Amino acid sequence: STHYLIINNAWEIKLLNKHTGEITDSPFGELSNAYDLYKDSSGRYWVSFYGQGVKCYNQDGQLLTSYNTRNSNLSNDIVLDITEWDKAIWLATDGGGVNIIYPDTHDIQILSNKENRQFPANSVTCLCHSNNHMWIGMVREGVLGAEKGFITTYTKAAQNPASGLSDKCPLCLWEDKDGRIWIGTDGGGINCFDPQTERFTHY
């Protein structure tokens, strides 16, 4: 494709021509308050609208379905990040934990400390899927590494910096080609986590 779908600083979805830099209207029409955008493995587009839950569109911009607290079991309408794992759509919400949508059945699974007291926080900022893990960034509770049936939490380490984050409020997560997880923090710089050694490097 010669175009990228982008969300501009006015929270509008636009098409960016990667060769010319020209920005034009997207197939989604005039939509406002768009916060995050994700294309899944089936070619569908998932768009979160701030305070309005999430909507799913086909590649022509036709609305397929929508999920919010009024028409579904979604636990919170503020969706900050969207990703996919095994055909399920994972949503990071600001106050409702992680919501997992199974598109084929429209079922929604909730991961929050309301549902499970062992889940550290309900305000989730970011998600990153890596191999058999889902990395979950949580407000003031660090990063949670979730495998199927197993959860590990990494928080700020006071005495041994290499064993924990430099700041326990992650803002973004990214995986590099070597499988390391890079974590942007709110006040602690950038952290790099190596899942093989379970050690952190702070920058």
Enumerate the language-model features and the residues they cover.
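Carboxylate-rich, polar loop motifs that coordinate divalent cations or form catalytic acidic clusters
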Residues: 1-203
